[in-house]
């Protein structure tokens, strides 16, 4: 299509990529009207967050979409990194939140994405630190201990609250992965 009159009229410069500008303007409102995709490390996170949003913010629940993990999508922090890179590479335009656990694997995986040039519609974050995890019982090769597990062992279950995490008034300890009590 001839746009000479638009260039002559000052609406565009000769070097402007008019078709790219037009496409950007057309899709500009699309992401704001589409669901926000929430990506998590596993099915439990998605199920809990979906149910929590529906319970606490029912008027907002239709604004979010979760990865359908029933289709055998792999879980874990490493898999989430691959999914985020795939979304970026495929040009998925929905606003997307990649939510990692607040543990060692989650922080390590999220840091891998810091050097990746992600589009502005994708944000990467971890669950926040919580006061309950500042002094939490753990079980591992050095025996039972009480320490901060913020940043090292906070999966979504630690955000359920003290009442859910206790048995007979005692917090259920975090068992360090790979630790087998039988090998003491």
Q: Which residues make up each language-model segment?
A:
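Acidic, divalent-metal-binding catalytic cores of TOPRIM
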Residues: 1-184
């Amino acid at each position: 299509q001839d746009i000479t009159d638009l260039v002559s009229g000052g609406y565009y410069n000769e070097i402007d990529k008019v078709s790219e500008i037009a496409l950007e303007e057309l899709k500009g409102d699309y992401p704001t009207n589409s669901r926000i995709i929430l990506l998590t490390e596993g099915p439990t996170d998605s199920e809990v967050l979906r149910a929590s949003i529906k319970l606490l913010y029912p008027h907002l629940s239709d604004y979010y979409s979760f990865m359908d993990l029933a289709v055998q999508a792999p879980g874990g922090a490493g898999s989430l990194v691959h999914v985020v890179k795939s979304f970026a590479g495929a040009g998925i335009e929905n606003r997307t939140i990649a939510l990692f656990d607040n543990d060692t694997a989650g922080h390590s995986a999220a840091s891998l994405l810091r050097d990746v040039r992600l589009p502005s519609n994708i944000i990467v974050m971890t669950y926040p630190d919580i006061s309950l995890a500042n002094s939490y019982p753990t079980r591992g090769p050095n025996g039972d201990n009480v320490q901060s597990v913020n940043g090292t062992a906070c999966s979504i279950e630690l955000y359920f609250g003290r009442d859910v995490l206790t048995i007979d008034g005692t917090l259920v300890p975090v068992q360090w992965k790979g630790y087998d009590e039988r090998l003491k």
